[in-house]
């Protein structure tokens, strides 16, 4: 992602969704270009705001843990081997052409799986992005509690029940209902996610720096 800014990531994601429709959720790592600035509390970045504006739930994986991004990392590895390392590219245009061919071939190989996936709605023709609009919808963060059962999230520390230490939690930030719900999460049984805690949460109303 060297050379990719939050603005260009936003534009590329929007271009992809215009072409292929809107997913129900989009999974990201915790890079500031996707999540927003880490040095300030209650920060929701450009890409997060785009997702919320279009009704897509952004999901941020557990920091510094492997496995959650395995599918995309595998895809990236194949692209590196099949496109980047295999050819000498005279210029950016050549690279983009070869990359587009690879992506198209990958979609053809996955056509059956894509056909089974839920249908993606198109972006509404009257949709207008407003990065200053009040935030609404859900943002999900996957996190791991520390030795005291605490979770660090959005620049705050939340105490989850003490019995759930060093364990995975799904933190569901409900910007519409103004609360955060914490659910236990087990890799062995991902369908079993009992509610551990609900806390009030309201995003401070500040101007987003565009």
Where in this protein do the model-derived segments appear?
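Active-site beta-loop-alpha junctions of metal-dependent nucleic acid enzymes
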Residues: 1-25, 200-204
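Charged alpha-helix within mobile-element recombinases
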Residues: 40, 47-129, 134, 175
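Short, glycine/acidic-rich beta->alpha junctions
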Residues: 5-9, 42-43, 163
